[in-house]
Each structure stands twice: as structure tokens, then as C-alpha cells.
């Protein structure tokens, strides 16, 4: 693909090859044109492409004789009026013509086009025209008739011996709306009077002799192919100018430009069987070339005309309707820097045609053309395919050549950078609340308030306030109170009273809302109230009423909630009071306010009721107050963090208020708060590193945008600076997404590239010694317009997908494991080599992948090697260094590709690594670390074939189990320590993501956290110190670790997520139910006996010596208890309101609730229908009240104590679908869902449930408390019968 200065040409040739025959212009044709009948008018309306207003008219014969000033014609300025005016004038002129030349005698007589144009022009300007009528019909030839005329026609024609001078009439006229707007059509100076003169003669030789003695400095133009109306030269005027911003061009250039564009359009449209009016539309320069330089527009248009005649095509299609904007851009490209990269150069006296040009104009039969046998273009013949414009920037993947330059050269082209600029900020986080919670669990260790973590001392420092503010501004969400309230209610309504088996919070309760505000957009009350009352919050039944209290209420009572007030009693009090309103940032004042609010909540809650209180600043003093004043007077509690914005605010939920108990804080609360504060500190630190909201990006921030703009880009050796600039952007931004736009801007065609710099890309750039240069080919071939958009820092409005979030989690683990100078061997690197952005720039790296790398080579400052091979093959690793081996998201695919089991692939992986000098292996494995459950839509697990299926990608991989993988490791490395790297819920992994300007999505994070359980990271310290496990590492059971090789003075720490679970330095402070540590001097080993109350991954660390050096000992997994569950139904079912008791056998660790699946969505079943309680023998009993509708619904028992409801247990209650209903006693009947249902008794329809205006049969009664799955659907008591239900 060649460039001619800034004009990009296509890589194929095309020309019209079939020419239509000329047809003589007869008097019949002339009169038909004067009729101007609809659809056959001798003009064409031209519109502004933005407004669609008609702003100009293109004129055809016989209207091309308008040579006087516009005011001489008296034309109306609006097209509709102009058209009426002209049609009336032409109609009158036709009758004048027919009066002299009756159609009956002159119908086929040939008309002199020169005279026809002049006649119409004179008539429309009210000039004398009768002298022209005798010349209308051709006697000899058009030219000779006028040369021999004895009348004075100097206004239109002049004779110069054998040469006839004809004034060029307008080809366009402007309407009032024409303003030379960017979207107006270009008129090429042909709307001006006297823009050119035409000189006609029977032979070109006579014309040449004429111009020997006349001034040709303006440039003499010629149509060699089928010159209109005869051989002629065209002399444009230098005084008539037309604007093509930023250029002003004269009439000669304007005419060349128009003809050149027309020929390029004809080339693109050419087809073998499609005739063209003219094979070569171009004007060529016949005289005057000596007056133009190679940098002039005239000369360059001459080159383009030559190329168009030879069949070259523009790489970028010409729009069907030209605009001034497009033309300005085209002229700007013509005049930009560069060179003519084609072998064609214009000659003054003839047009050279290449030997292999598809054009059939030829000097053998046509004057002015010479085919050059020695001139060959070597291009294929094919019309260019027109591509549609693209409305938004398109992603671009850079590719590299072996060329390099100095890194400093990239800084030298800074003039192409668009920095500083003010980008849009976008959203760093989208989606609903990411909720975390903990509730009271009596199996947990008792913890005092003083042992709970304290609010960070720096919380009110200025930089932390800035971080919170930035996160809040860049967090895209609707009404934040609504989102938080909804999340809190969903969790609170799931809590179950173990003494009754029913939820604490149920439908129809009275509710008080403390802190209600009328300041919500579009409502004069908190936005949660209306959907709550209407039962539209999934899993949250509607209350009987909600009364509002607070400073800013509109539908309630104004009151100071921190002081006693006559509120009345409510079964549920929801307090959304902010301590910052009265307490600001004074912790003592705000803590006292919390205590007052908690007291008000207690006073307003009826016995056995519940309340929620928001705590903005959870300090130990508040926990101590709750411990002393609240916990003894409630039966259970829950702490919820609906993570919407980054702060330490939590919601405390109290259940069973005013009932005595011995509740305490627990280790679960301790772990929850540790994660909570770590999560806040992590995101606060990240936010403080991000640029400020609304910032001006000058390139100094670690995270930001890189934008370069290249006008009229070419990629020849003449525009090396452009290539260096693009390469510098790629070096600055690494693997960040890059987008390109190619568009018109102020007369220039612009290439804009946008990407993002980050600490990760800075690491990669710091590794470079030289600047690798990109291959511009993929940019060169772009001929489309790709529209730009305003650069956005966080651009993904939907947020990262679950798979991207999962990858970010792995990236964090890799970056955390590698230290300065570590030699890294990365397996399954991928073409993008992300590893180079994760490890220190001082760390040598060997990257191995079966696919070729897309990274440059030979440009690195530190040894960086790329090997293309199968890393599961033998022999290749000899001599390859690697202190730490990393392998992420690769081994499963490699096993699938080789049709191996995961065990076999992992064994070969270990065998290969064992031949190296590696100390650490960090590998992502396909291995469940928890109860096997599919992740809907993302991960399907086939336990029979031991395969993972990824439906989003249409692939599957094998998986293994933890024991097998550990056994394979220890068989090769007996003394290794193995760590199953836990996923921390403090979100520390988001640092890399957010600093790379990746938008996170709450739902995606939840899914990625689930997937991580089945695709964990395994760390093997090959030369570590192993732990020996004994006993059952199951929640609530005794287990022990034996750790040899340490001294009695050494200490062992155990971590659960981010929190310290216990330390042997003080086992009494342990956060697990039981731990004892003993040292055997004889065996020189430690034994740790433990009981755990939380399932998950625990990591062990030894602290040795006077320097307290940490040594990783590996990890172990504490499993949840057995998930087996059975339901034993009695032989005789009870269809009365007493219900049927069903014995449930399940481990008491699990808390259960009944759910129903409606339209594929889980709904909590009505607690009045299903009740769980402990029987006298200590077993679990489920009481269910039976309904005819049960046969038509899918009920399940699901566990509710995990972060994911139903993660461990989803047990179908299949008997409900198969029960035989009695026909001799009253039964209960509800609608199975909200649709209309036909109720049939013995096959006869007796009524339609849920129908409009439904009235139950007279022998039906309504049950006071519904036992339908939904509390909003009534239950009827129906007489004995044989009932069936049919949906309508």
C-alpha cells in the first residue's frame, strides 16, 4: 500500500473499461429539459449532511450558461421557491423556441449545446436572447457555426481565429442556507462567475499554437478523453478562490480536485459490464507546469490525476455525498509531508499509462495518452471493497519488528502527545453492594471487646479523607442508601431463631425507620420504603407498616433520636442515623451518639423484636458498650458490611430483644473486623495513588492516560517520527488496552491512539534498554473512518468480567511472590507476556509458551528470554535458570491439549521442574478446595469424569484433588512445604487492577471468588520444612500438626485469611476454640493440637532466631462437616394446620432454610409454611404445612451460613411433588405462582385463581395465616374433593 504524501492508496487497481456512446443533443431533448418534469429536472439539489437542508443546486445542460453576477438573475434564496421560479421561466422560454423551431419539423435536429446554455443564461438574466436563436440548430459544427457567426456574442463567445473562447458557466448555485459549513457540499469554485474560460478548436495542435502566445501561468487544463462538446483547453482564473480550510485554493486547482475525486470514485465503482460516460474524468495539465513547484497543490493534484487515470484507488472510500469537511481533509493530506511512493510522475504534454494499468485509454487510438511498456505497477486488478465507518474507537494490538531506537528518542516526539488533557474519569467500581457479614455462632471462641481490632488511628487524616472521597466519586451506583438498605435487609431477614426454626423477621411486622430523610432524589422518603412495603425486595417480605422518625422526615415525626421520645413499640426498628451529622470526626462524641441511638432502638423495639443500627465508626468503646448493655438482652446478632463505598461503616443487627442471654463477641466477629479494616486500608491506599477526580493528566501520575495524535499519518521512511511516537506509547502503556481512531479534524485526517499507563506498565518499561519499534502495517491498511471518543480513565462501564477478576487475583499472587533479583521461569506465558509487568525489572526472566510471543526481543536491559516449546516435554529445562517457577491459568489447558489427566500433567510438570534449580513453584491448579458446586454460567463440574467445563469459552479441562497433588509433590520433594494460597477477602488483589484503571464489578468479584475455590494457587517451597498432619481437619473436630526441626524458643503463627488465628507465643489469645502447643525435646519437634470453628485455608509460619525471621511452613485446609442430609417423612402425613413433622439428619454446623424456585429464581419459602426446630432428642425437625399447590412447585432445603446461600446444601424435597392428596377431608389450596390457574375438582373447572376480580366459591374459607410459598398469596380451606391445578 503506497502513500502519495498524506494520501493513502489501496493495494489494487481498478478502472472503467466500457465507455457509453455519445448521443447527439436534439431539439426534442432540449425542450424536454426546459419542461423540467418531476424527476427529470436538469439540476440536482444538494443538502447539508448534518441538517439535511438544501443549500446548493448542481446545474446540468442547458443551465450551464449562467455567467453573470448572481443578482442579475433574481433567483429566490430558498430551493422550493427557486425551483418554481426557474420552471416557470424555462416553460416560457420553451414556447419562444418552439415558435421559431416547431417541433414537427425540428424534433431530431441537432442542437448546439453552447448556444442552448447561452440562450437559457440570457433568458434567465433578462438579457437579449433573440440573436442566439438562429444559431441553436447546428449547421456545420458547433465550433464552426459560432466562429462564422456575424452577430455580436462577446458576452458568451469570442473568436480568436480558429479558436473559440467560451465563458464557463456556473455548474453550481448557492441557496441562502449555504455558509461553507463543514457539512455543506463543496462547490469547487464553480458557483462563481468567470471561474474559467474554455478554448475550443477542431484540433489540439491549433490550440497549442494559440497558447504559445497567450499567458498560461494559471495552468492550462485538458480533458483528453471524450472532451465535452469538442477539443478544448480550460484556463482557470487565479482570482477566483475557494476555501478548503486551512487552505485557500484557486479555481484551477479546484477543477483539478473535483475531476480527480470523480475519477477515484469511478475507479472504485468500475465493473466490467458497467459502462462509464467517460473513461478518464481527470483534467491534466497541458501547459504551465513550469510555473508550479513540486510542493504546490497544482503539481500534487497533477500527480493524483495521473494515478487516478492509471487505475489507482484511494484506500479510504470516497463518501457518496462530499462535504467541505471531507474535502478539507483530503487537501490537507495532499499537502502533508511525505513523498510520492509510486513510479508515476506527470509529464506536461501527455499522460503516461503504465503497461499493466487496467485503463483502456491508449495513445494508439486516443490523443494525449502514451502507454509505457517499461513502466509496470505490479499490482492486482480489483475494485476496493468499501467498509462502513466505525462509530467508536477500535482496539489495536501492537506488533513489533526487529528495529530499535534509543529510549530517549521516544521522548523527542512528545509534540505528538495530547497531554496534558482532562479525561473523563469513568467508574472504578460498578454494581450492587459487595456484602460481608458475620453472625453469632456459639461454637466460636469467646472474645472480649478489648480483643477486637481497633479503628485505624489515621482514619480522619486528610489523605485518608481524600481517598474515601475519590472512591465515592468514582463509584457508579444508584441511590447509595437504597443499595445499602436493601443489602442489609436481605441478610437480616435470613436470620433464624434456633429455638423456633423460624426467621426472626417475618411478613406483617410493624417497622420504625430511624433517620428517615426526605432528601432522596425523586422521593420524599428513603427509597427502600416503597419496595419494602410492596414486597418487591427479593427475600424480604412486606411489613404491616413503616413509621418514619428523624431530623429530615417528610412523612413522619421530626425528633432527636439520641434522646428519649414517645415512639411506641415496633417489632423491627431500622436505624440509618449517621453519627457524622452530630459527631463529625470526634470519636468520643460520635461514640456517645451511637450509644444513645442503640438505647433508643432498644426502647422502641417490642419484646422478641429486632433492630438494626448503623455504626459509622466501629471503635472498641462501641463494641464494649454493646457487650455490656445490648448482648445480655438479645438472643442473637449479626454484623453486616454492605460494601458500597470505602469506609468502615457497619450495621449491627440485634435479634430477640429484651430476652436475657449470655451472648458474647466471638472469634468470627474478630476475623470479620480484621478483614473489614484491612479491606478499608487496602482500598484507601489504592485510592490515594490514583489521580484526583477531574484531574488534568500531564503524564506525571502513576496511573493515567497516554494519548498521541498524528495528523495525516504516513508510515514511510519519511514519517519515522510517527512510528517512534507510537512505539513510545506502547512502551509507556505495556499490555494496557489500546484503541485507535482515524477521523477528520479541522481539515486534517488524524490518527489518535489512546492507552493507559500504570505501575505495571512502568515495570515493563523499566526493563527496556532500547525502544522496540512497532510494525505499522495494521495501521497502514486502515481506510475506514473510526470515530474518536473522549478518553476515559476507567473506560469499561460494565466492569471487568469474572474471568478477568480471577486473572487479576493470580497476578497479585505472582507479583507478591517475586522479589528484586529473583530469577523467574514463567510457564504458559502467553503472547502478551504479562509476567513482565508483574515482576521487578531487575529480575531475569525466561518465558515459555507453545505459542509464539508477541513481545519484542533484544531490547531488554535484563536477561529476558522467550522460548517457544511445550513445557511438559522433556529435556528443554537443562541450563534454564529459575529461582521461582510460575504457571498461571495454563496447566489445565496444557493437560486438556495433550489429553492427559490433571494428575498426569501435574506429575510431568513436577518432573520437569525437579531438573532445575528452582526453590519455589507457584502454580494455579484445577483442584476443589471446598465442597464441589458448579458456578452457574461459568464453571460446570463433572465429578464422574473429573472435568471442569467453562461454558463461556466452550472448553473443558481435567481436575484433581488436594491430596493427590500434595502426594505428587512430596514424592519428588519429600521436605517441601506446600501452601494453598488463600484468597483474602480484604481485596488486596484489587491494587493491581485499580491502578491499571480496570473497572471492577461487584457481581464479577463474587463469581471470581467462587471460581478461585476450584482453581487455587499452590505454592511449593521445595527446600522448606514440612508439617505432618494427623486427625480430622474438619470444623469442630480434633486435629494436630507435628512440626520437626525447630527449637523450643521458636514461635508459630497461624493465619486465617488476613487475620492471626493463633500464635504459640500466647495460645490463650487464640481466635480458634482450642489450641495447645507442646515441644518434645527428645524428638526436637513441636505438636499443635487444635479445634477449628471456621472452614477454609489456614497458613502456618515459623518465626525463628533473634531477628524473628519468618519461614513459610505451608498451609492446611479445614473442611466443613459432611454435607450429607436426609429427610425422613412419617408414613401418615398430616394435612391439617398442625402440619407434618419431618426428621432431618444433618450436621448441626449447617443452618437450613426452605426455598422455592420460581421462574428459575430462588425465593425464601414462607416461614409459616416451613419451620425448623430442635426436637427433644436434639435432632432437627422440619414442620411443613401441606398444600395442594406443593405438587406444582420445586422446594429445596439450602444452607444459609456461608457467604453463598446453598453453597454446601441444596436438598430437594421431592416427596412434596409426589404426595397423594386425600379426598375425604378438608385441604389447603393456594396458587402456585402469580399466573392464573384453573382449579378443577373431579375434572370440572370450578374457578380461576388469580383472575381479575376473583371471588372464591361459597364453600371455601380463607386461612387466617397463609401457608402459600409466598406470604402475599392467600391460602383457602377447600372441602373434600379430587383437586388438580392447570396454569392458563
From Swiss-Prot:
The residues that hold ATP are 892-899
Q: Where is this site: Involved in formation of the phosphoamide bond?
A: 190
One Pfam family recorded for the sequence: Reovirus_L2_MT2
Major location category of this protein: virion
Cellular component terms, GO, for this chain's entry? Answer: viral outer capsid
Does the record bear Transferase in its keywords? yes
Q: Which domain of life is it from?
A: Viruses
Quickly give the catalysed reaction. Answer: a 5'-end diphospho-ribonucleoside in mRNA + GTP + H(+) = a 5'-end (5'-triphosphoguanosine)-ribonucleoside in mRNA + diphosphate; a 5'-end (5'-triphosphoguanosine)-ribonucleoside in mRNA + S-adenosyl-L-methionine = a 5'-end (N(7)-methyl 5'-triphosphoguanosine)-ribonucleoside in mRNA + S-adenosyl-L-homocysteine
* InterPro entries registered for this protein in UniProt: Ig-like_fold (IPR013783), Reovirus_L2 (IPR010311), Reovirus_L2_4th (IPR048604), Reovirus_L2_6th (IPR048603), Reovirus_L2_7th (IPR048602), Reovirus_L2_8th (IPR048294), Reovirus_L2_GTase (IPR048601), Reovirus_L2_MT1 (IPR048598)
Name its cellular compartments. Virion
E.C. numbers: 2.7.7.50, 2.1.1.56
- Provide the alphabetized UniProt keywords: ATP-binding, Capsid protein, GTP-binding, Methyltransferase, mRNA capping, mRNA processing, Multifunctional enzyme, Nucleotide-binding, Nucleotidyltransferase, Outer capsid protein, S-adenosyl-L-methionine, Transferase, Virion
User: Can you name one GO molecular function term for this protein?
Assistant: GTP binding
Which family does the UniProt entry place this protein in? Belongs to the orthoreovirus lambda-2 protein family.
How would you summarize the oligomeric state and partners of this protein? Interacts with protein mu-NS; in viral inclusions.
What is known about what this protein does?
Outer capsid protein involved in mRNA capping. Catalyzes the last 3 enzymatic activities for formation of the 5' cap structure on the viral plus-strand transcripts, namely the RNA guanylyltransferase, RNA-7N- and RNA-2'O-methyltransferase activities.
Protein name as annotated: Outer capsid protein lambda-2
The protein's organism comes out as Reovirus type 2 (strain D5/Jones) (T2J)
Lineage runs: Viruses, Riboviria, Orthornavirae, Duplornaviricota, Resentoviricetes
